[in-house]
Swiss-Prot record:
Known partners and oligomeric status: The complex is composed of two ATP-binding proteins (MetN), two transmembrane proteins (MetI) and a solute-binding protein (MetQ).
Assigned GO CC terms: plasma membrane
Molecular function GO terms recorded: ABC-type D-methionine transporter activity; ATP binding; ATP hydrolysis activity
Annotated signal peptide: none
Function comment: Part of the ABC transporter complex MetNIQ involved in methionine import. Responsible for energy coupling to the transport system.
Residues engaged in binding ATP: 70-77
Membrane topology: Peripheral membrane protein
Similarity annotation: Belongs to the ABC transporter superfamily. Methionine importer (TC 3.A.1.24) family.
Protein name in the entry: Methionine import ATP-binding protein MetN 2
Length: 376
């Protein structure tokens, strides 16, 4: 970004009257817990300025679990850290409960950060202190009386399932238990927002599921707004309500998780979600050709169910419409946010229908269908 463009960005930031007009036209903005408006962040180094974020316009609703994904260097950490002002934006605004936190002085920033909890990939526990002491420490620093501290720590250790580990030291805990301590510590000041920065990336799959279950419970019981960044797409699928995709500091796609996962539009989204997709089995891919080599060659179809319909896919109707011998080579259907999302690779042999007819019939019953080629 040029120096001229940097100077112009603040001029594009909406005024208070413009924000009011936008909120009137879009009532959901009035409910936004966190809102980013034309947000930009530029770092200045020896090699010159590097734009980490640009023109970010985004609203996170109260009480939702909101995911941020993107490739390395996309700006995920920079974005999440502007919520508690650990990162100072170069331009634009961050509103929390409709209040511009960029105008806060140091005292208000301290108060803000107490209302925003944060957990990290590395648990940041003090090795010489017990579980109880690690959770209690922020309360002690804040000058909370001993009795209140004791009550709060006991409540939080029960919430995260560590009441029997209060005298243990971090070295005696598993990775999942350490993260539970981190979560308890992040909740000591009764925050309204919880930020999760790769909170499960150091954990095994089973422990990850237990931590996600705890975060889901906290979200439901306490009404917390949770904003998380992760490179694990399964985490977004399993816990988030909505997701935004970043690329080179820009938003390239956003929406409900079922929508983005079921029918990704941007190439970056498709690349990130590729590990969750099932591909053509190798033994079939090696035999694939554009034209049938024999009269009994099988046509391979790639069929997607995007969740756009409230009703699940009717596989029986699909197989009947295709006719002939239909074989499922790879894939399946799962439910994300009560929507049926599926990806099937089908082999169709012996059908009376032509290639174009088979494709048309598949598209009548599935939102997306493509011909991969022939085998045989």
């Amino acid at each position: 970004m040029t120096a001229t463009a940097q100077r112009q960005l603040p001029l594009d930031t909406p005024s208070a009257s413009t924000l009011a007009q936008q909120a009137e036209l879009h009532p959901e903005l009035n409910r936004a817990h966190v809102r980013f408006i034309n947000l930009g962040k530029t770092y200045h180094g020896k090699q010159g300025p590097v734009e980490a974020l640009g023109n970010i316009d985004l609203a996170v609703q109260r009480g939702e679990i909101f995911g941020i994904i993107g490739r390395s260097g996309a700006g995920k950490s920079s974005l999440i850290r502007t919520i508690n002002r650990l990162e100072q934006p170069s331009s634009g605004r961050v509103l929390i409960d409709q209040v511009d936190i960029g105008e806060f002085d140091e005292d208000k920033l301290v108060e803000l950060r107490r209302r925003i909890g944060m957990i990290f990939q590395h648990f940041n526990l003090m090795s010489a202190k017990t579980v109880w002491q690690n959770v209690e420490l922020p309360l002690k620093v804040a000058g909370v009386p001993r009795e209140q501290r004791a009550r709060k720590v006991a409540q939080l250790l029960e919430l995260v399932g560590l009441q029997d580990k209060h005298n243990a030291y971090p070295a005696q805990l598993s990775g999942g238990q350490k993260q539970r301590v981190g979560i308890a510590r992040a909740l000591v000041h009764d925050p309204a927002i919880l930020l999760c920065d790769e909170a499960t990336s150091a954990l095994d799959p089973e422990t990850t599921q237990s931590i996600l279950g705890l975060l889901r419970e906290i979200n439901q019981r306490l009404g917390l707004t949770i904003v998380l960044i992760t490179h694990e797409m399964a985490v977004i699928r399993d816990i988030c309500h909505r997701v935004v995709v970043l690329e080179q500091g820009r938003i390239v796609e956003q929406g409900p998780v079922w929508q983005v996962f079921g029918d990704p539009q941007h190439d970056v989204s498709k690349t990130l979600l590729a590990p969750l997709q099932t591909g053509l089995p190798k033994e079939w891919a090696e035999r694939l050709s554009d034209q049938p080599q024999r009269p009994d060659a099988a046509l391979l179809l790639d069929v997607h169910f995007t969740g756009a319909s409230d009703q699940g896919p009717d596989l029986a109707a699909l197989f009947a419409a295709l006719g002939g011998k239909v074989q499922l080579l790879q894939g399946g259907v799962e439910r994300i946010q009560e929507r049926a999302i599926g990806h099937l690779i089908l082999s169709v042999a012996g059908s009376v229908h032509t290639r174009d007819e088979l494709l048309a019939r598949a598209r009548q019953l599935a939102p997306r269908a493509e011909v991969l080629g022939y085998v045989g």
